[in-house]
């Protein structure tokens, strides 16, 4: 019998598959006593456990033959209608996906070939980098910070390159927590429209704003201008539950058709029971739920910022988010976030080093903190521990 060589059997794309750094780090943070700022996990106290149990039983009792059957790839019609009303589009423009991660995977399959240029912020969402990398593209990056991407740098890149699409997170970006101001959104969109480019706008955190009102999305601004080139990705993970894996994409019919066809080859459709459950949970009291979600995250963000102001040495810089789930931290040049991570684990606190959020490398002195899963007391104690680790690292310089 000839020995089997798995590496010979794998396709070229398998060589591009990399483990999620966050998923691997989460394994290290599971030991007892660890306070974790690592995973971008929503606050578990917001999960509607009792309501979900009652709604699931009701769906199975009254519509079980529908919930347990195959369904159209585009999604459960009442949920598509709900999304359409929420976002301000027509139901036929909506595709329900199995989480936003699937939407990113579908976008990569539809738009990218090996060597295709695709533009991302640096840093950007690690899951998007992971999804797009499967297609073997060429990553173009522009610096991003507390007020979104550097538009002067973006303009310079667009003078010499024509990316297949720009992947952007204008509202409460993962990992920086940055919020692109309205004038910058308009300038960015003007650059895109002048060149006839596609934008993939990931708006998973759209409702997690701490101020009085939500800024209009690039998608909304483009629609007002009559421009069809923005593909809009949204999710129920942050406002309801990530475990249900229900999200959506909104796009021009020509683009949506290709995404639907790609989804047919991936999983046929998002689980019908999950779609029906999301619709049942949100068809009443949605506004009240969003207000509670915003209040919880606002209080947690305030708790983290108060603790950071108290515990973190002045040489260390960090963002002050206006929404979302993350604080982005920058150590003095020459210091390593991975070195800090090892010290932090000794103090029983964890975070995510920033390097993996940079598609083309860099960011060795950066890190992401999530305030979503711990309560205010846990946040304060976790930051105390992080402060000790930081002071220990800085003492070596």
UniProtKB/Swiss-Prot annotation:
Q: Which reaction does it catalyse?
A: L-2-aminoadipate + 2-oxoglutarate = 2-oxoadipate + L-glutamate
Partners and quaternary state? Homodimer.
What the protein does comes down to:
Catalyzes the transfer of an amino group between 2-oxoadipate (2-OA) and glutamate (Glu) to yield alpha-aminodipate (AAA). It can also transaminate glutamate, leucine, and aromatic amino acids. It also contributes in the biosynthesis of other amino acids such as leucine.
Q: What is the effect of changing residue 20 to E?
A: Strongly decreases the affinity for AAA and Glu. A mild decrease of affinity is observed for 2-oxoglutarate. Increases the affinity for leucine and 2-oxoisocaproate
GO BP term, pick one: lysine biosynthetic process via aminoadipic acid
Which Gene Ontology MF annotations are present? 2-aminoadipate transaminase activity; pyridoxal phosphate binding
Binding residues for pyridoxal 5'-phosphate: 70, 100-101, 174, 202-205, 235-237, 245
Put simply, this protein is called: 2-aminoadipate transaminase
What gene name is given for the protein in this entry? lysN
- UniProt organism field: Thermus thermophilus (strain ATCC BAA-163 / DSM 7039 / HB27)
The cross-references to InterPro entries, in alphabetical order and at most eight, read: Aminotransferase_I/II_large, Class-I_PLP-dep_aminotransf, PyrdxlP-dep_Trfase, PyrdxlP-dep_Trfase_major, PyrdxlP-dep_Trfase_small
Q: What is its EC number?
A: 2.6.1.39
**Pfam family, any one:** Aminotran_1_2
Cite the entry's keywords alphabetically. Aminotransferase, Pyridoxal phosphate, Transferase
Marked site positions, Recognizes the side-chain carboxyl group of acidic compounds: 23
Top-level taxon of origin: Bacteria
- EC class (word): transferase
| Entry-annotated residues carrying N6-(pyridoxal phosphate)lysine | 263
């Amino acid at each position: 019998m000839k020995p089997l060589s798995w590496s010979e059997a794998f396709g070229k794309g398998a060589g591009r598959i990399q483990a999620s750094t966050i998923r691997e780090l989460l394994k290290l943070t599971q030991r007892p006593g660890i306070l974790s700022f690592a995973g971008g996990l929503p606050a578990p106290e917001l999960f509607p456990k009792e309501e979900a149990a009652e709604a699931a039983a009701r769906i199975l009792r009254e519509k079980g033959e529908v919930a347990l059957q195959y369904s159209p790839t585009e999604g459960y019609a009442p949920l598509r209608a709900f999304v359409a009303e929420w976002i301000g589009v027509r139901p036929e423009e909506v595709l329900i996906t199995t989480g936003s991660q699937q939407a990113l995977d579908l976008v990569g399959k539809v738009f990218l070939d090996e060597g295709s240029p695709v533009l991302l912020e640096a840093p950007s969402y690690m899951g998007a980098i992971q999804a797009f990398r499967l297609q073997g593209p060429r990553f173009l990056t522009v610096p991003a910070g507390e007020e979104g991407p550097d538009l002067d740098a973006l303009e310079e890149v667009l003078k010499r390159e024509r990316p297949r699409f720009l992947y952007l997170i204008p509202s409460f970006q993962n990992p920086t927590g940055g919020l692109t101001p309205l004038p910058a959104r308009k300038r960015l969109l003007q650059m895109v429209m002048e060149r006839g480019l596609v934008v993939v706008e990931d708006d998973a955190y759209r409702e997690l704003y701490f101020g009085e009102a939500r800024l209009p999305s690039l998608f909304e601004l483009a629609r007002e201008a009559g421009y069809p080139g923005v593909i809009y990705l949204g999710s129920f993970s942050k406002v309801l539950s990530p475990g249900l894996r229900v999200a959506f994409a909104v796009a021009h019919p020509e683009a949506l058709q290709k995404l639907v066809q790609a989804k047919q080859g991936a999983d046929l459709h998002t689980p019908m029971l999950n779609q029906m459950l999301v619709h049942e949970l949100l068809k009443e009291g949605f506004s009240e739920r969003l207000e509670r979600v915003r209040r919880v995250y606002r209080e947690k963000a305030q708790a983290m910022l108060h603790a950071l102001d108290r515990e973190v040495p002045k040489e260390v810089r960090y963002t002050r988010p206006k929404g979302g789930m993350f604080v982005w931290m920058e150590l003095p040049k020459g210091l390593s976030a991975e070195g800090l991570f090892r010290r932090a684990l000794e103090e029983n606190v964890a975070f995510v080093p920033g390097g993996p959020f940079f598609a083309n490398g860099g960011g060795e002195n950066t890190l992401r903190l999530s305030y979503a899963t711990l309560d205010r007391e846990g946040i304060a104690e976790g930051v105390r521990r992080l402060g000790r680790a930081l002071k220990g690292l800085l003492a070596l310089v």
